[in-house]
């Protein structure tokens, strides 16, 4: 029986990426942009019910909730070719319409102010499910709505639906470009705290790496937002393919998460995808892939240039960094014996450096390709990996935060906009509650980075047992 997943898309980035995700799911299941089943979509074998439900007129409606504090992006969706796809009752735009002003505190408190409205939407959607498994949330960690309101949604759902899984697709800002959002490090730190404490799995999507992949692998001179969002949506769709086109293993979200996350706090996952082709980047000319054997795909997935997280590590750190776990989702008509041979070759050549305290093996899930989408390649692959080098991304957030705040909170640059939010202003006007919030978030994120560093040690398990 399908285990349903409710999808939340929060803020500008979340809704832009989310609309691309639903566009891909409709294509893969033979669903027209108005939710009607295409005449040619008669083959079956897929589980549409995981992400869609049917209305009385048999229209397929996404299990999606669209949230934003300013109207531009959602208004764009409502006037696009997807305008008849979503349930209008599941769309929330703030009545003020002024957005969060790139301010985490504003996004958080505006979400808190409409708690009952948000819960009504979530509860109603949950009632449409026969066996709700969990939630996916798509958002950015750097702006105001995706970070602040997204953080509030994580707290709200983990409290209300404590036994259901929460997985996020979290977009990290481009580290190689100067941002016009000067408080980006504040927003990122406060959001990372909630992702650490309230999410069960976080798929890290790093704009730095995505831009680099688009330029170097897809030969796009200046990739635009839509092209990057299409890449992200490709990863999202591929990561759910075993749920929608089930095989023998990894047919539910619980199984996927359990196979990748042996220790609860270390639940931040990297991704790699191959082959990167024209359909991944909205029809642009791309690099030619000459062959797509299982071995070729699995080798490519381990190449750093295909990983969608950029950690800017020193050579010494790279040598110490290790895989905690790897799950390769291989799509296409594949002979299982070829998978076994490919794994043997990779193991013999020691192409993946694993932790010493866990099973040093690559897990593989085989999935069918959609019969309704024509591709130029026979086999494609997505890697979901738990890798200790992700800690360098957290350390970068901490360093950027300290540049603004100061090591002992002595600088407090650009803090006034946060202090102006009533929740974080105390009676004395000093914003003590806000400073405590930042100090706590810093400690949580530092502990997270330290935990990933500790995973690189052979005696990690013994240390954990002694600590407990």
Swiss-Prot record:
Q: Name one GO biological process term.
A: microtubule nucleation
Q: Name one GO molecular function term.
A: GTP binding
Where exactly are the transmembrane stretches of this chain?
none
Q: Name one GO cellular component term.
A: cytoplasm
Q: Which UniProt keywords apply?
A: Cytoplasm, Cytoskeleton, GTP-binding, Microtubule, Nucleotide-binding
Can the keyword Nucleus be found in this entry's annotation? no
Family matches, as InterPro entries: Gamma_tubulin, Tub_FtsZ_C, Tubulin, Tubulin/FtsZ-like_C, Tubulin/FtsZ_2-layer-sand-dom, Tubulin/FtsZ_GTPase_sf, Tubulin_C, Tubulin_CS
- Tell me which Pfam families the record gives: Tubulin, Tubulin_C
**Compartments, as annotated in UniProt:** Cytoplasm, Cytoskeleton, Microtubule organizing center
Q: Which positions does UniProt annotate for GTP binding?
A: 142-148
| Keyword GTP-binding in record | yes
Q: Which SMART domains match?
A: Tubulin, Tubulin_C
State the family it belongs to: Belongs to the tubulin family.
Q: What does this protein do?
A: Tubulin is the major constituent of microtubules. The gamma chain is found at microtubule organizing centers (MTOC) such as the spindle poles, suggesting that it is involved in the minus-end nucleation of microtubule assembly.
Name of protein: Tubulin gamma chain
């Amino acid at each position: 029986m399908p285990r349903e997943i409710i999808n939340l898309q929060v803020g500008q980035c979340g809704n832009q990426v989310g609309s691309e995700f639903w566009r891909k799911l409709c294509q893969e299941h033979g669903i027209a942009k108005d939710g009607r089943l295409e005449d040619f979509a008669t083959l079956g074998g897929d589980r549409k019910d995981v992400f869609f439900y049917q209305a009385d007129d048999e229209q397929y409606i996404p299990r999606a909730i669209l949230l934003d504090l300013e109207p531009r992006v959602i208004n764009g969706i409502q006037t696009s070719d997807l305008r008849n796809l979503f349930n209008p009752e599941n769309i929330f735009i703030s009545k003020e319409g002024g957005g969060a002003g790139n301010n985490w505190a504003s996004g958080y408190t505006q979400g808190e102010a409409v708690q009952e409205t948000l819960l009504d939407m979530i509860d109603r959607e949950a009632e449409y499910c026969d066996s709700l498994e969990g939630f996916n949330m798509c958002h950015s960690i750097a702006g105001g709505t995706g970070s602040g309101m997204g953080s509030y949604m994580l707290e709200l759902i983990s409290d209300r639906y404590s036994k259901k899984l929460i997985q996020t697709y979290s977009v990290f800002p481009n580290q190689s470009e100067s941002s016009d959002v000067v408080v980006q490090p504040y927003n990122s730190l406060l959001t990372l705290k909630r992702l650490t404490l309230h999410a069960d799995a976080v798929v890290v999507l790093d704009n730095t790496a995505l831009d680099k992949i688009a330029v170097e692998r897809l030969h796009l001179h200046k990739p635009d937002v839509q092209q990057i969002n299409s890449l992200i949506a490709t990863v999202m769709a591929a990561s759910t393919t075993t749920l929608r086109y089930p095989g023998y293993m990894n047919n539910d979200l619980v199984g996927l998460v359990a196979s990748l996350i042996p220790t609860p706090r270390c639940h931040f996952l990297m991704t790699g995808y191959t082959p990167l082709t024209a359909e991944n980047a909205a029809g642009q000319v791309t690099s030619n892939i000459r062959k797509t054997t299982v071995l070729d795909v699995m080798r490519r997935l381990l190449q750093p240039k295909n990983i969608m997280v950029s950690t800017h590590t020193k050579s010494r750190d790279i040598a110490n960094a290790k895989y905690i776990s790897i799950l390769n989702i291989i799509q296409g008509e594949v002979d299982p014996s070829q998978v076994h041979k490919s794994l043997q070759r990779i193991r013999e050549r020691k192409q993946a450096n694993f932790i010493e305290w866990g099973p040093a093996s690559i897990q593989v899930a085989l999935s069918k390709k959609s019969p309704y989408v024509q591709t130029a390649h026979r086999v494609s692959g997505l890697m979901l990996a738990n890798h200790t080098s992700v800690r360098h991304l957290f350390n970068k957030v901490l360093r950027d935060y300290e540049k603004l705040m100061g090591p002992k909170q002595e600088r407090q640059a650009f803090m006034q906009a946060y202090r102006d939010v009533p929740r974080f202003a105390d009676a004395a006007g000093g914003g003590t509650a806000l400073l405590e919030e930042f100090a706590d978030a810093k400690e949580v994120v530092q502990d997270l980075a330290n935990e990933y560093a500790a995973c690189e040690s052979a005696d990690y398990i013994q240390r954990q047992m002694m600590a407990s």
